[in-house]
């Protein structure tokens, strides 16, 4: 838009899903390009920040992103395991990252005592970044998904009415309709 205002010409914007996926691999790409190290699969775990991954609770899973020492201290206080923060194996991020398997067991032992929603509420009070991991039903029915218009209605002459994922790109002057036009035959 700035370029159009400056030059009077518009432009084509190309955003590919592949490019977006590669962009999110910034840490792995940096490690490969700087150290020629090919990262191994780690699940949801961050390679150098701990704890920063999914943990099992009593009923499901929670993502916790205690990305610095202050957040880890708050997390230990919420979980009522402040002594863990005093242990040299876990007292700073570098030590926690080296001992993450042991730390994960300690955290999951405590997290298994309550359901995810209870932990999320407690952690959010202390501004600890966290959130539930939704199954597809929970994700689709989440009020935030509805408010972002990410499930929309469409029509196809053979299939009839159906729903599909909405457009993740939101633009202030483009009306993001809750209903898409008729789907063409291919």
What do these predicted ranges mean?
Residues 50-126, 130, 183-184:
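Aromatic-enriched alpha-helical interface/lid elements that frame and gate functional surfaces
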Residues 32-39, 142-156:
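Short, surface-exposed loop/helix-turn segments at secondary-structure junctions
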